[in-house]
Amino acid sequence: MRQHCQSITFADNEYDTLSEPLKIMNFAMKLHYQLLAAQAENTDTLPILLIHGLFGNLDNLGVLARDLNQQHSVIKVDLRNHGLSPRSDEMSYAAMAQDLLTLLDDLQIARAIVIGHSMGGKAAMALTALAPDRIARLVVIDIAPVAYPSRHHDDIFAALTAVSDAGLTQRQQAAQLMRDYLDEEGVIQFLLKSFHQGEWRFNLPVLFANYAAIIGWREVPAWPHPTLFIRGGLSEYVQNSYRDAIARQFPQARAYEVAGTGHWVHAEKPQAVLRAIHRFLGQP
């Protein structure tokens, strides 16, 4: 199995950027979170902030949290319009980053290690522009700091909407209907984790209305600190053609690929992902 860690090599690190620092806004929301104290005694390690992706919640990175919690305090968070966090018509990465910064402030966390998957990875990268000195190290799982040209979730939106329109209340009924729209059983079961008493625990209309912003991206200023990009070998979200964009914004980036995995690489091969994270956190 091909699982390796490598430096991202770039031909030219001279570039111009039109990006500007994100401005601190006043639309921050108080996010729902869970704080897990480090299991090890007398540890002086930095806390880790875990950020889920689109349609997810704070439990989605639980397999990572349980391992990392042995040596680190871990904060699991529901992003706005997800889980038990507040709802809003605003769903920009600037807003998500401000929410995360407010959470760090409320918890009196001066610096943290930030790990985000998919949309959560983009929110984490946006946080580097808003509060560059508050992040010690950054891990981005299967997403790149680019605007994606294609819509990848229209079938998912159709399935979710069909369940809502049908007024279903049981997960088994919802799963049966969703199979008319989706072929991947793993995706269906992932989505159903957010289905409770006939309601989706994410703001489906707002996510649909803001989907262009979610797959879009405004480049952030170069963040010259250790960054790890983990990609699934079968995923199309982090392509070699994105290396220049990564280099401009994260000049200390390293790459780690886990063969035989798709977009949910951390769920498919969690031990490989954890090995990469531990190795990265142990590097100078």
Where are these regions (language model features)?
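Flexible "cap/lid" loop of the alpha/beta hydrolase fold
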Residues: M125-L130, A136-L168
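Catalytic active-site module of serine/aspartate enzymes centered on a nucleophile-bearing elbow/loop
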Residues: A253-P284
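Active-site loop/oxyanion-hole signature of alpha/beta-hydrolase fold enzymes
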Residues: L36-A40, G62-N69, I75-I115, M119, ...
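Conserved serine/cysteine hydrolase catalytic core
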Residues: G198-Q249, E257
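Active-site glycine-rich loops that stabilize anionic/oxyanionic intermediates
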Residues: G53-G56, S118
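The conserved beta1-alpha1 loop
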Residues: I51-G53, R231
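Alpha/beta-hydrolase fold catalytic core
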Residues: R2-L49, N69-H72, I109-R111, F250-R254, ...
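Conserved alpha/beta-hydrolase catalytic His-Asp/Glu region
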Residues: R151, A166-V220
